[in-house]
Amino acid sequence: VIDEITPHVDPHKVMITFTGGEALVRKDIEACGRELNKREYPWGIVSNGLLLNRTRLDSLLAAGMHSITISLDGVEEAHNWLRGNRRSFEGAVNAIAMLAEEKEIVWDVVTCVNQKNFKDLMLLKDFLIELGVKNWRIFTIFPVGRAAETPELQIDDTQFTWILKFIRHCRAEGKIHASFACEGFLGNYEGEVRDQIFHCNAGISTASVLIDGSISGCPSIRANFHQGNIYKDSFVDVWNNGFKEYRNREWARKGQCADCDM
């Protein structure tokens, strides 16, 4: 796929991210990274940090890794509950502590808010600041798979509003740059809780190749919106001629949005 798209793009302007699941269970991430680096593509990973020790981090950096995101979903009890592993919190914190010492890599921490960690967000904020975290993204959990069947993973409307106000407070305070995730239009909170006005880039400027080869705008989007599969379709052809549901927004031009130029 990379060699197919290379004649059509400026590699310096295309970011490749390995996510999961857990990216670091792959032993060949560095080999893939070196090939991307050879072709001058910046690349990064999203990780739970459990497998990220000093040796592995040095190996990733030597392979040209530009960015990394670490998931930390609350203080120890809440994080380990969500991850289902009593060592997860320790692994994530150790990974964050290592990254705080690095000067050349772009990195941040993401937190998925749920009923188990909601009450500890203020405490978690202070803990992240103490660890040296500068950038913190806060997500809610999309209700699919296990999340749709586990009430503790969902927050209510009042809690959601509190989170937006909390992020706004963090940004005004200036001790850590907090942002809400990319999902959803936020009404009057737009422009206050993240760095840009909401616009979903799935199928517009981003695409995903999933574990089975499916071509999607984003891993969070349902399978019935997949556009093809790299094992039987040309990625460039799919990109140039597919994604019509993503790019044609006429269905949204109604009511107060009828005359929108976006």
Model-derived features: where do they sit?
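Conserved alpha-helical substructure of the radical SAM core
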Residues: 1-67, 155
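Residue-level recognition of the N-termini of beta-strands and the immediately preceding loop/turn
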Residues: 12-16, 107, 254
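Short, solvent-exposed turn/loop segments enriched in Gly/Ser/Thr/Pro and often Arg
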Residues: 21, 181, 262
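Hydrophobic pocket-lining residues within nucleotide cofactor-binding pockets
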Residues: 23, 50-52, 113, 141, ...
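Radical SAM enzyme [4Fe-4S]-AdoMet core and its adjacent flexible, acidic
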Residues: 58, 62-216, 220-226
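Membrane-interface junctions of multi-pass transporters
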Residues: 194-197, 221-262
